[in-house]
Amino acid sequence: MTNLRKTHPLMKIVNHSFIDLPAPSNISAWWNFGSLLGICLMIQILTGLFLAMHYTSDTLTAFSSVAHICRDVNYGWLIRNLHANGASMFFMCLFLHVGRGIYYGSYLYKETWNIGVILLLTVMATAFVGYVLPWGQMSFWGATVITNLLSAIPYIGMTLAEWIWGGFSVDKATLTRFFAFHFILPFIITALVIVHLLFLHETGSNNPSGINPDADKIPFHPYYTIKDALGFMFLLLVLLSLALFSPDSLGDPDNFSPANPLSTPPHIKPEWYFLFAYAILRSIPNKLGGVLALLASILILLIIPFLHTANQRSMMFRPISQTLFWILTANLMTLTWIGGQPVEQPFIIIGQLASILYFMLILILMPLAGLFENYMLKPKW
């Protein structure tokens, strides 16, 4: 009798995706982040669901309801800390996952890559609306500053901003709709993840060498299920350590004060995972220019497949491209640092230089490095 997992209509899908899936034999720990992101998403949906049972999306009670969750609900403090720090783990895994894709040339699977970029944007939108919900000072002013950027759009900008606000400023209507968005978006993300996997399984996984791995494939289970399990344990160890020992280290102290439209915090800044984009936004003195640069900093990922000039897919054997990649990584860390600093010298000029370098590396230097490496590989006799 044929095994049930190979014949049952539902189990067959699971079997082809997670059990009998042919996987390259040489994929490293950098390929763990897809499954880690899946775990992060599940943790966020579960903890978020339990938080939503006790949260009230009203300007008068939102802040108090979060305090109530932490003080009075059974393990509410733990659920909230897991949810808040789970977002940080989510973005850490996301950035490493995207970085892996750039380093090893995974972006040449264009459909998978494009769905991935859409996923990144959706997760960023979810995190942004979620940060507004506790209705602390930074929640309110972060929402005010970022939604206000819509008003930079010519002609329709202000109408658009007021439409998003549901009034003439960030208020009760804004909070209620942001809660609705924050609840629905993770399920949209889940649907997109399935599409992302669908396109990935059309081509199969890339591997560190960047060459066709079809000659040497191994079944996903038990090899990569065990390998992923190690990743899960490490992720949960880090998340629990954060949530239990230092739950507020990645948050902003201003968010412990209830939202007050009459008092502006000294430095308005988003959570750490948005600081690089915030630094690029602030580096341009013009409002519309800043908004366009902010969008370009993320949407530039969509054109990376078309900027691939090298004959080799992966950077594994391309030392010049490798050097530029690590300069890009250091540059993003610099931007993250600058995004959290006040708008004064020398931070302004450092932010502007780092922003210019960010776009130069992706648009000019890395494609040129690929061409130069092609030239160096040609026989010279």
UniProtKB/Swiss-Prot annotation:
Cofactor: how bound: Binds 2 heme b groups non-covalently.
The keyword Electron transport is assigned to this record: yes
Pfam families in UniProt: Cytochrom_B_C, Cytochrome_B
Membrane topology note: Multi-pass membrane protein
Keywords per UniProt: Electron transport, Heme, Iron, Membrane, Metal-binding, Mitochondrion, Mitochondrion inner membrane, Respiratory chain, Transmembrane, Transmembrane helix, Transport, Ubiquinone
A molecular-function term among this protein's GO annotations: ubiquinol-cytochrome-c reductase activity
Entry-linked PROSITE patterns: CYTB_CTER, CYTB_NTER
Additional information: Heme 1 (or BL or b562) is low-potential and absorbs at about 562 nm, and heme 2 (or BH or b566) is high-potential and absorbs at about 566 nm.
Function field: Component of the ubiquinol-cytochrome c reductase complex (complex III or cytochrome b-c1 complex) that is part of the mitochondrial respiratory chain. The b-c1 complex mediates electron transfer from ubiquinol to cytochrome c. Contributes to the generation of a proton gradient across the mitochondrial membrane that is then used for ATP synthesis.
Protein name: Cytochrome b
Organism: Sminthopsis macroura
